[in-house]
């Protein structure tokens, strides 16, 4: 892939003045372009360089995701499948850029993992504090994987809260028909940090990590401005909007706080505690 020199190609999208046209990780390569012609140009470069070292581009495993109405596309007479989303490094990326697809998927995976732990969590030989630690160590990471990059709306917050209480009620063997409020359950569990609090803490830590770095690709993707116009009507919530709303300060103030480690650690601790 280094021989293809994709980074030197003009095709791609510009974020903060930097041209980005590919994301590479092990055997997964994602090409990012603005037009059909640019995609064909990059694909042919990858195909030609692969053939030089005895590799073949597998068209059946190559998918196209587009925000336009392209339904099918051919390269060298072979039809490439068009999809509305794909998985990359364990996260689902969709054409509409909405994180709710990924959050709902992780909630379903969390419920599945919880049911697999039934035999352990229902055992009377294991103490309640140990069971709580097992849930936090084996279940919550399934739900929070990749949450640092999510743009979470109010609906998703409610769903994660509902999922957490579902876990605790199942752990305590409290049926859904029982009229028990959440406060007595939390007192019995004695959980210091909620699932939502854990996610917010991870997002804040990741934000500080990005802003303290130099001009890295991750920082440009998260904080850089994309050329072009946003659509008309009410604008969708951005990742950075959620961060500034969470810590209740402007972006300029955030830049100043991040430069001072002790002040930033105090902000992170305050968010986790609240």
What are these regions (language model features)?
Residues 1-274:
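Short linear motifs embedded in intrinsically disordered, charge-biased segments
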């Amino acid at each position: 892939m280094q021989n293809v020199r994709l980074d030197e190609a003009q095709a791609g999208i510009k974020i903060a003045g930097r041209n980005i046209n590919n994301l590479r990780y092990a055997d997964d390569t994602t090409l990012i372009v603005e037009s059909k012609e640019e995609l064909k140009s990059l694909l042919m470069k990858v195909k030609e360089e692969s053939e030089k070292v005895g590799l073949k581009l597998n068209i059946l495993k190559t998918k196209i995701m587009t925000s336009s109405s392209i339904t099918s596309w051919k390269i060298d007479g072979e039809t490439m499948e068009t999809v509305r989303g794909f998985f990359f490094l364990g996260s689902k990326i969709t054409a509409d850029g909405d994180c709710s697809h990924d959050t709902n998927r992780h909630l379903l995976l969390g419920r599945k993992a919880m049911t697999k732990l039934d035999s352990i969590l229902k055992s009377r030989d294991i103490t309640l504090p140990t069971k709580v630690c097992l849930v936090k160590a084996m279940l919550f990471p399934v739900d929070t994987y990749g949450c640092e990059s999510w743009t979470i709306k109010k609906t998703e917050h409610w769903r994660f809260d509902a999922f957490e209480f579902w876990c605790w009620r199942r752990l305590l063997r409290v049926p859904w028909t029982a009229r028990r409020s959440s406060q007595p359950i939390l007192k019995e569990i004695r959980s210091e940090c909620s699932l939502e609090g854990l996610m917010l803490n991870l997002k804040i830590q990741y934000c500080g990590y990005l802003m303290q770095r130099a001009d890295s690709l991750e920082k440009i993707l998260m904080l850089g401005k994309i050329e072009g116009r946003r659509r008309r009507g009410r604008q969708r919530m951005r990742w950075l909007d959620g961060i500034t709303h969470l810590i209740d300060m402007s972006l300029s103030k955030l830049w100043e706080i991040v430069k001072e480690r002790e002040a930033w650690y105090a902000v992170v601790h305050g968010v986790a505690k609240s």
